[in-house]
Swiss-Prot record:
Cited PANTHER family: ACTIN
Family according to the record: Belongs to the actin family.
Signal peptide coordinates: none
Disulfide linkage: none
Swiss-Prot/TrEMBL keywords: ATP-binding, Cytoplasm, Cytoskeleton, Hydrolase, Nucleotide-binding
Molecular function in Gene Ontology: ATP binding; hydrolase activity
Protein name: Actin-42
Catalysed reactions listed for this entry: ATP + H2O = ADP + phosphate + H(+)
Pfam families cross-referenced by the UniProt entry: Actin
Superkingdom of this protein's organism: Eukaryota
Compartments in which it is found: Cytoplasm, Cytoskeleton
Annotated source species: Solanum tuberosum (Potato)
Further remarks about this protein from its record: There are at least 13 actin genes in potato.
Length: 332
């Protein structure tokens, strides 16, 4: 969250709401009934954590309202009734969801004006393009969204229910094989950090399994040190081979290709030449090269393929929103 015209968000926090697992023992401690974001994260040991956004779509409106309240009043410190708001939504978000979002903004927060934009379209704007295909992968969902001259092509959008959270779960599982135990919602957050700091994507997975001898260490919050080797690239490999976790789905490369193939034959060349990665789950080192290699193998042999992985892609949806909301034409 942040302000239009800024080049980076002012507030970045996980969309988590935590509630105490046990009622307070200490009298007069003024215990809150719910914690949001980083505070929920830091007190995660005594809380049960809930994610109100599942697979990119809001499923728990009461908790979502708490998150928005926290955003306005604690993070940005603004009065929502004084500022127009730009919200984003997942591609193919049900219309009822958008209506509910609008209702809460106007009725609960009294915003003077609002607009809802599709996330992937904003990522493309942030990359300075109006035509291309965005492979956006966050925590709960991945999408491939072909966009032509600024308009998303809904018939060719594909959704893949495979994203950051699944990779974290998989890493929890393969670390268990090494004899480390991570089970609670709080420990999942530790594993997520391991994933973000140490994972990478192999250009050739089979070869990497043979060659890989490098081991890295990671210090847990309690001081214990764990060692991680092939797990580093085995974890995000799931993006290209969902069958590893028993999912019957196409990988992100094949989903991108399938999306392009659902588009008019005349615009495919423009899409192949502008494949833009966005979202936190595309932050793994090696992802652009691997994506390029896999799509080259699927595409017609003379096709020029370009995979763009902007350095700020973790926040490119937000940056695109900042650009859009600061345009004078948009404000009218």
């Amino acid at each position: 969250a942040g302000f239009a015209g800024d080049d980076a968000p002012r507030a970045v926090f996980p969309s988590i709401v935590g509630r105490p697992r046990h009622t307070g023992v200490m009298v007069g401690m003024g215990q809150k009934d719910a914690y949001v974001g980083d505070e929920a994260q830091s007190k995660r040991g005594i809380l049960s954590l809930k994610y109100p956004i599942e697979h990119g779509i809001v499923s728990n409106w009461d908790d979502m309202e708490k998150i928005w309240h926290h955003t306005f009043y604690n993070e940005l410190r603004v009065a929502p009734e004084e500022h127009p708001v730009l919200l984003t939504e997942a591609p193919l978000n049900p219309k009822a969801n958008r209506e509910k979002m609008t209702q809460i903004m106007f009725e609960t927060f009294n915003t003077p004006a609002m607009y809802v934009a599709i996330q992937a379209v904003l990522s493309l704007y942030a990359s300075g393009r109006t035509t291309g295909i965005v492979m956006d992968s966050g925590d709960g969902v991945s999408h491939t969204v072909p966009i032509y001259e600024g308009y998303a092509l809904p018939h060719a959008i594909l959704r893949l229910d495979l994203a950051g959270r699944d990779l974290t779960d998989h890493l929890m599982k393969i670390l268990t094989e090494r004899g480390y135990s991570f089970t609670t919602t709080a420990e999942r957050e530790i594993v997520r950090d391991v994933k973000e700091k140490l994972s990478y994507i192999a250009l050739d997975y089979e070869q990497e399994m043979i060659d890989s001898t490098v081991e890295k260490t990671y210090e847990l919050p309690d001081g214990q040190v764990i060692t991680i080797g092939a797990e580093r690239f085995r974890c995000p490999e799931v993006l290209f081979q969902p069958s590893i976790i028993g999912m019957e789905a196409a990988g992100i490369h094949e989903t991108t290709y399938n999306s392009i193939m659902k588009c008019d034959v005349d615009i495919r060349k423009d899409l192949y030449g502008n494949i833009v990665l966005s979202g936190g789950t595309t932050m793994f080192p090696g992802i652009a090269d691997r994506m390029s290699k896999e799509i080259t193998a699927l595409a017609p042999c003379s096709m020029k393929i370009k995979v763009v992985a902007p350095p700020e892609r973790k926040y490119s949806v937000w940056i695109g929103g900042s650009i859009l909301a600061s345009l004078s034409t948009f404000q009218q």
